[in-house]
Amino acid sequence: MAIERTISIIKPDAVGKNVIGKIYSRFEENGLKIVAAKMKQLTLKEAQEFYAVHKDRPFYAGLVEFMTGGPVMIQVLEGENAVLKNRELMGATNPTEAAEGTIRADFATSVSINAVHGSDSVENAALEIAYFFSQTEICPR
């Protein structure tokens, strides 16, 4: 199995519900190590750039507004098949379709207020990690 890194963002709704620790416990209990983390208030420019892949989609403006509406917790997760494992832990984008016990089933409100973001591929994970973290901020353990 491949050791990978992925990005996880705990979105403003989940930060506001004070469930960061509960989400971190799920990562750790499932073999993912947090090797970098920061709390950040995203600027409009940062949110627009980070989600630029969606700029032509109808939900883009609302997503950018939501992601700048409060602080987020951004972390780099490391472990075997980290990208897939994190996506399994997150659950479906729509919390009504998310499997019981997933982060979104337990903490998300709707398809647009859905608690967490996670990279969808190893390639995108590398780009997303580099967007928020320098190599010196990542501490393998």
UniProtKB/Swiss-Prot annotation:
<protein>
    <recommendedName>
        <fullName>Nucleoside diphosphate kinase</fullName>
        <ecNumber>2.7.4.6</ecNumber>
    </recommendedName>
</protein>
<dbReference type="GO" id="GO:0046872">
    <property type="term" value="F:metal ion binding"/>
</dbReference>
<dbReference type="GO" id="GO:0004550">
    <property type="term" value="F:nucleoside diphosphate kinase activity"/>
</dbReference>
<feature type="binding site">
    <location>
        <position position="114"/>
    </location>
    <ligand>
        <name>ATP</name>
    </ligand>
</feature>
<keyword id="KW-0460">Magnesium</keyword>
<dbReference type="Pfam" id="PF00334">
    <property type="entry name" value="NDK"/>
</dbReference>
<keyword id="KW-0597">Phosphoprotein</keyword>
<feature type="active site" description="Pros-phosphohistidine intermediate">
    <location>
        <position position="117"/>
    </location>
</feature>
<dbReference type="GO" id="GO:0006228">
    <property type="term" value="P:UTP biosynthetic process"/>
</dbReference>
<comment type="subunit">
    <text>Homotetramer.</text>
</comment>
<feature type="binding site">
    <location>
        <position position="93"/>
    </location>
    <ligand>
        <name>ATP</name>
    </ligand>
</feature>
<dbReference type="InterPro" id="IPR001564">
    <property type="entry name" value="Nucleoside_diP_kinase"/>
</dbReference>
<keyword id="KW-0963">Cytoplasm</keyword>
<dbReference type="GO" id="GO:0005737">
    <property type="term" value="C:cytoplasm"/>
</dbReference>
<dbReference type="InterPro" id="IPR036850">
    <property type="entry name" value="NDK-like_dom_sf"/>
</dbReference>
<keyword id="KW-0418">Kinase</keyword>
<dbReference type="GO" id="GO:0006183">
    <property type="term" value="P:GTP biosynthetic process"/>
</dbReference>
<keyword id="KW-0546">Nucleotide metabolism</keyword>
<feature type="binding site">
    <location>
        <position position="104"/>
    </location>
    <ligand>
        <name>ATP</name>
    </ligand>
</feature>
<keyword id="KW-0808">Transferase</keyword>
<feature type="binding site">
    <location>
        <position position="87"/>
    </location>
    <ligand>
        <name>ATP</name>
    </ligand>
</feature>
<keyword id="KW-0067">ATP-binding</keyword>
<dbReference type="InterPro" id="IPR034907">
    <property type="entry name" value="NDK-like_dom"/>
</dbReference>
<keyword id="KW-0479">Metal-binding</keyword>
<comment type="function">
    <text>Major role in the synthesis of nucleoside triphosphates other than ATP. The ATP gamma phosphate is transferred to the NDP beta phosphate via a ping-pong mechanism, using a phosphorylated active-site intermediate.</text>
</comment>
<comment type="similarity">
    <text>Belongs to the NDK family.</text>
</comment>
<feature type="binding site">
    <location>
        <position position="11"/>
    </location>
    <ligand>
        <name>ATP</name>
    </ligand>
</feature>
<keyword id="KW-0547">Nucleotide-binding</keyword>
<dbReference type="InterPro" id="IPR023005">
    <property type="entry name" value="Nucleoside_diP_kinase_AS"/>
</dbReference>
<dbReference type="GO" id="GO:0006241">
    <property type="term" value="P:CTP biosynthetic process"/>
</dbReference>
<feature type="binding site">
    <location>
        <position position="59"/>
    </location>
    <ligand>
        <name>ATP</name>
    </ligand>
</feature>
<dbReference type="GO" id="GO:0005524">
    <property type="term" value="F:ATP binding"/>
</dbReference>
